[in-house]
Amino acid sequence: MSDTTKKRDALVFIGRFSPFHNGHKAVVDAALKRAKEVVVVVGSSFAARNIRNPFTFDERKAMIEAVYPTDRVKVVPVSDYPYDDNKWVNAIQSIVDQAVPDAKDVGLIGHSKDSTSYYLNIFPRWKNHVEVADVGGINATDIREVILTSMDYTDFEELSTIMPSKTLSCMAGLLSKPEFNVIRAEYEMVKKYKDAWKAAPFPPTFMTVDAVVVQSGHLLLVKRGDMPGKGLWALPGGFLNQEETMLDGAIRELKEETKIKVPVPVLKGSIKASKTFDAPNRSSRGRTITQAFLIDLGVGELPKVKGSDDAEKAFWVPFNEVKQEKLFEDHFFIIDNFLNIG
């Protein structure tokens, strides 16, 4: 069958590709046999570097395009929106429409590997998705473990059987960046953190609290002083103490980390909303559920704040300067859920 007589105009392959491996390649190869064009949608494209997403969108795009230097494969970015499937679906449909504006017969292609593959059934416009068989159980998590635990590039030889050679060469060049030393240190810190809980009879679930404090079009944030996420912006918050309510814990953490010059009764009286955020993979430290409180202080002069405790710095940021790539874990999406700034 020639390229001009493919059954589908375009097939869409969604993933994080962190990094791109032979399992991903098998899907793209299958898509190229079935469609004129393939749109590779890269999730978590605007997240700050972390253990689960150590590569930027541009780096992942370069790894994919090293294997497919053809106009038939379009590599495009998308954000995650873990708490709003409708926004996520709309973002993907919009970016695909831009990538292949003339395509009429569009479908999804992928492999239903686990709970993260639910997306294959939530795009009603793209019917009859193409299912592709798993390729040898290749897992990007295992690849990340290799690259985050070794600085010896000879150790990467084992990856040559599960990654395209051009992708592996591209990735090896990226791993010399100083940013990866930070991610490697964070990986070791998280590993030790999890090791401390190995003897527990059940995997632990942690409860945290966060404060989304706004005033006069500004949001109160802190700069994290410790790993994971050292140096990233974050909401004031932390782990819930056993003897306190979630509300009291949120106010306590807010006061400890920002020294905000607002009385506790005023803070409590300014709470406009509260919501639980429980995406299973929201934290690298393990299963962590957070309760966030929206505290709207109205208009007026911004209260003085000062970083303390776990926070290196506390500061007010205009809404339009709150950027996903600067924020820790899923904090951008918590903020967006309350303020709709995304």
Q: Where do the protein language model's features map onto the residues?
A:
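A short, structural micro-pattern
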Residues: 102, 137, 205, 287-289, ...
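Nucleotidyltransferase catalytic core that binds NTPs
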Residues: 1-192
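Functional cleft and adjacent loop/helix regions within the main domain
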Residues: 90-98, 106, 137-141, 155-184, ...
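N-terminal strand-loop-strand
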Residues: 191-235, 262, 297
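Short, well-ordered beta-to-alpha junction loops that form the rim of enzyme active sites
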Residues: 110-114, 224-225, 291
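Conserved G/P- and acidic residue-centered "switch" motifs that form tight phosphate/ATP-binding loops
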Residues: 21, 236, 254
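Short, conserved active-site loops that position catalytic residues or coordinate cofactors/metal ions
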Residues: 41-46, 229-237
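Unchanged
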Residues: 239-337
